[in-house]
Regions:
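Substrate-binding pocket helix/loop in short-chain dehydrogenase/reductase
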Residues: 106-107, 114-116
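C-terminal beta-strand-loop-alpha-helix "lid" module of Rossmann-like NAD(P)-dependent dehydrogenases
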Residues: 182-233
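Active-site helix of classical SDR
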Residues: 130, 166
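Conserved glycine-rich cofactor-binding loop
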Residues: 15, 22-24
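Conserved glycine-rich Rossmann-like NAD(P)H-binding loop of the short-chain dehydrogenase/reductase
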Residues: 36-52
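The beta1-alpha1 cofactor-binding region of Rossmann-like NAD(H)/NADP(H)-dependent oxidoreductases
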Residues: 70-81, 112
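Residue(s) in the substrate-gating loop at a strand-loop-helix junction
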Residues: 150
Length: 291
């Protein structure tokens, strides 16, 4: 719970909640918002992973602006406990649905259960936490919800169908959400990053694990995708750029729905939109043949 002394300290601060704050975009965004004097409720599934965040916050003298809270967005018991925690808070200004991971493999060989797990975190987790905070924002007639999507929510890549489909779903849900809550003074925005140097790119290892069968008919295709991911490691963007963009959206008086960010992301979205599908398909498949 937020203790009485902490409540006094947060009285004149904007309060932000961010899921998946133990690393990557979540950790960096927590620190950047704290620098802007937000009181940040930094949630994570495993509290043992808070060490890096707390260490960096202490070095920057930001610990007074950060409250680490356990939250597994896929576990109803954890969500219920988080709801009890929220009962001690008088307002919520920003929600950043950042918790997520990427699963890969080829559709024929991926168990349906893997798709369910992917959606539980990347989509249903965001829905669950959003449902918790909406009554606060609606009552105060203000608030901002920032959903961390991906270029994979706009472009379907082979070998990544669980992740791609979960992000496409997040995009459609966010569009509906924005139209539903806009009349209550609540904004919804989607951030669509390209490839960045975060641990979400453990997907490369996941791909290898899912496709380790040397007799798989997709083995050669998988090897090419694996090579593409590995070759891209040297060109991954700086995740601080994404954290800064999230803060920019949080601070903006007005927001649009979608914010693509990253090398080549806007161009790729534009090209896919204007090209006939047959030409787009030809270019994508040809790019893999050249590997």
């Amino acid at each position: 719970m937020i203790k009485e002394k902490e409540s006094e300290r947060t009285m004149n601060k904007k309060i932000a909640i961010i899921t998946g704050a133990s690393s990557g975009f979540g950790l960096l965004t927590t620190l950047e918002l704290a620098k802007k004097d937000y009181f940040v409720i930094a949630t994570m599934r495993n509290l043992e992973k808070q060490i890096d965040l707390i260490s960096q916050a202490t070095k920057l003298d930001l610990q007074q602006n950060i409250k680490v809270q356990q939250l597994d967005v896929t576990d109803q018991g954890s969500i219920h406990n988080f709801q009890l925690f929220l009962n001690e808070i008088n307002r919520i200004d920003i929600l950043i649905n950042n918790a997520g991971y990427a699963n890969g493999g080829f559709i024929e060989e991926i168990p349906v259960e893997d798709y369910r797990k992917q959606f539980e975190t990347n989509l249903f987790g965001a829905i669950s936490i959003t449902q918790l905070v909406l009554p606060y924002m609606r009552k105060q007639k203000s608030g901002k919800i920032i959903n961390i999507s991906s270029i994979s929510g706009k472009v379907g890549f082979p070998g990544l169908s669980p992740y791609v489909s979960s992000k496409y779903a997040l995009e459609g849900w966010s569009e509906s959400l924005r139209l539903e809550v806009k009349p209550f003074g609540i904004d919804v925005a989607l951030l669509e990053p390209g490839s960045y140097n975060t641990n979400i790119w453990e997907v490369g290892k996941q791909l290898a694990e899912n496709q380790s069968d040397t007799t798989s008919p997709y083995k050669e295709y998988m090897d090419k995708i694996q090579k593409h991911i590995n070759n891209g490691n040297d060109t991954l963007g700086n995740p601080m750029d994404v954290a800064n963009k999230i803060v920019e959206i949080a601070e903006a008086r007005r927001t649009t729905l979608r914010y693509p960010i990253g090398k080549g992301v806007k161009f790729m979205i534009f090209v896919k939109k204007v090209l006939p599908w047959r030409l787009w398909e030809f270019l994508v498949l040809r790019s893999f043949k050249k590997m």
